[in-house]
Amino acid sequence: MGQLVNGVWTKGSVSNNQKDGSFKRVDSVFRNEISINSQIYKPETNRYHLYVSYACPWAHRTLIFRYLKKLENHISVDYVHPDMLDNGWSFLKNFPKTTGDSLYGKKYVHEIYQISEKNVSSKATVPILWDKKTNTIVNNESAEIIRIMNSAFNDITKNYDDYYPSNLRIEIDKINKVIYENINNGVYKSGFSRTQEAYEDAVKKLFSSLEMIDEILENKEYLVGNVLTEADIRLIPTLLRFDSVYYCLLYTSPSPRDVIQ
């Protein structure tokens, strides 16, 4: 997948690997909040829009929150084509349930980034939380988008269900870190490693963390406390894709293979 460099789409793979061959995810660029205290992004119905892909686990978690928080009539959504090719995510509509770009009629997701910021340097990822009023990206970090959805629109939806309750936040943050580093991102660390040592280290951490999850859930339904929280929702999209996608494409086997030539 390419990326935007000073507003220009650059094709070809851009390495995210460290000197030791391990994979490091690039931080998201747009990190704004929606809040009554925000100078720009206030909570409003039908002002905000999601760009997502059904193929993307990071986007999947935002769709779960959109549903749970009763935001489906307040935040609109477009579904991109699940194949990511030379021009990145596209708005082709030749796949079931893809919508095209209903706002601007663009062909590619990177063009949405260019609308928001002409000279942006960024990966053109989904999910994107978009502001239709200012024609800008509010946020493209899924972990922050779900936090926004959890609380910013409560007074509009009258849905006060809290998936990041204050009394459980320390525990949620602790397990979120393990889930992100070793499972959510761990599957990519496995598949995108460039040395055998980095690959085996990623696989070891992945499966030890999955064993930890198994132990936690052996006698209870949820990861933290006795209620559904953000931690569960962050884990689910990865687990759903594990056997059918990651095992095949990213070599997530409990017995590491000789995959680095």
What are these regions (language model features)?
Residues E200, Y247-S253:
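Acidic, serine/threonine/proline-rich low-complexity intrinsically disordered regions
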Residues V52, T229, T252:
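Active-site-adjacent beta-strand anchor residues
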Residues L223-L249:
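GST superfamily/GST-like fold recognition
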Residues M1-N219, L223:
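GST-like domain detector, emphasizing the conserved glutathione-binding G-site
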Residues T125-P127, P237, P254-P256:
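Proline-centered helix-kink/hinge sites
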Residues Y251-Q261:
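Single conserved hydrophobic/aromatic residue that forms the stacking wall/gate
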